[in-house]
Each structure stands twice: as structure tokens, then as C-alpha cells.
Design a protein with these regions (language model features):
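Charge-rich alpha-helical segments
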Residues: 1-89
């Protein structure tokens, strides 16, 4: 998967945020599907926007007043692993 990656997650308005630009819509949508499976596995679902080859993600936890928790940080790490499959666990 070829993409431009915002290196770090930003903390914006009490949410973790990342934007990723892919080669095309198909690669962006493939990434979204992979994130959907992760979200189900962790029972933690991101807010996202997809416009053609760009995917924007926000992570936050509803149960604590829409703030960032360890659950969000864990999900961010798992999403990053999808973007960099050669990361060692």
C-alpha cells in the first residue's frame, strides 16, 4: 500500500487525529476495511472521513466524555501497524 502518512497522531480538541493520503480510492477503501475489522476486534470505533484517496481518522472514548484514553492510544498503534506492516511487535 503506497501512501503519504502523517507521521504522528495529533491531539486536537481532545481527540487523536491522523490523515493518510493513498495512491487512489481503492487503496484508501482497502485501508478503511482493515480498520473496520480492527474496530470490531477491539470494540472501539473511530470517526472517519473518506474523500477519494484521503482518509481522516479521529479516536476518542464516548464513555469518558469524548476524551482520549489508553483505549484510543492502543487503537492508534494498531492502525499504524496496518500502515507499516513491517513494524515488529
Amino acid at each position: 500500500m503506497e501512501h503519504f502518512l502523517q507521521k504522528q497522531w495529533e491531539e486536537k480538541e481532545d481527540k487523536l487525529y491522523k490523515a493518510v493520503i493513498f495512491k487512489d480510492f481503492q487503496e484508501a477503501f482497502t485501508f478503511i476495511i482493515k480498520v473496520a475489522f480492527l474496530a470490531e476486534k477491539y470494540n472501539h470505533h473511530p470517526k472517519w472521513i473518506n474523500e477519494y484517496n484521503k482518509v481522516e481518522l479521529w479516536l476518542y472514548t464516548h464513555e469518558v466524555g469524548n476524551l482520549v484514553t489508553e483505549k484510543d492510544r492502543t487503537m492508534a498503534i494498531e492502525i499504524d501497524k496496518l500502515l507499516m506492516p513491517d513494524i515488529e511487535e
